[in-house]
Amino acid sequence: LSIKINGYYPYSLIKIAESNGSFYPTEGAHRTSICRLLNLKIPTNTTNKRHLHWGVDSFKKPLISDKELNFILYNYFFLKDTARVFVVFPPAVGYADQIKEKINSQYKIKHELNLHLDEDWQLKNLLREMYSNDRVDVYKRDNCSILKKYNIIKEGKSHDFLILFAEANTTNKKQDIKKEIREELSQFVNVKDFITVHASDSIEEKNSLLNVFLNQNTLFHIKTMNKESELVDSLLKDYLFTLNKYNIKDSIVVGSTPLDLFGLRKTTDIDFCLSEQERKEKGFDQNPKKLGVSTDIVSQKPNYLRGEISDYALMTNPNYYFVYRGLKFATLEVMKKVKSILNRKKDIKDCLLIDDFIKKRKMP
């Protein structure tokens, strides 16, 4: 497995040398780590290098940071249509071994993630994102099924989740393993509460869960903000109406709205941008344009970040956005870059607000 500037190349071999009867890689530490992590075959080639010094210093610290690891995992599972994400709820985490054995009968678990939440409002935020699917009115109804889950789980002893990322063993149609797990654990967790295990049932839902659990920016927002923005929620209704009206497939909210979601200052409207290709397909030029009552498409000359980051990367690289209500929003770091380029009086004030926030919080 090799990631190069010019793209993925599956036959880039890692050179292996022999020393005292043992074989060692002479290069490709990151590739080797990734292959080991995902249980992939490591393509190798022998070399005649001998009498090399094999140091251990590189193993004294992680070869890959958490941010890099999540980025690698996100892209791996995003590209795998047969991948599935399983979320084990706190009441069932104690039966994780039984659940994993059941999942491994049809899938191969490639990665596990333990997620701990300290506060009830963090639990509410997480459930909101898990089930949002572009629904702004989550928790707005008294009989909301998600709110019922929240009320039950918050009374438990812990808010610990186990997330399992798996890949199907075969392409054959699978049984409803989620239902089977719930039934097998019914004596411990009430099936009707639906708080045993959740699993992605489509590629779209799988990708949505990846944007929650393998996006450090989304998890940061979930763990940071204890109040929901009623103003942003009301504006997002017009934004969603606009996206549907123009059949826009992918977009990202920029402007002041990300600042509002972190409680820095109130927003007044929704500004968003598209990829260059979709912008052309929809017949929009590079100039800003009002598309809804409170929704505007921004100027992209040549792109939103003036050449530093492509608009396509801005919307597809999870390092540049977080998810709220199932929708993508530019990170504060991205907005600081944009506003420092614009350098208007209001942008300078926003940069100071962002700087002050970052100093007080440990950003991902």
Task: Annotate the PLM regions.
Residues 233, 237, 285-362:
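Catalytic core of pol beta-like nucleotidyltransferases
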Residues 29-42, 204-214, 261-262, 282:
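Short active-site loop/helix that positions an aromatic residue
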Residues 218-252, 356-364:
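Helical scaffold of the NTase/Pol beta-like nucleotidyltransferase catalytic core
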Residues 239-270, 274-278:
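Active-site nucleotide-donor binding segment shared across nucleotidyl transfer reactions
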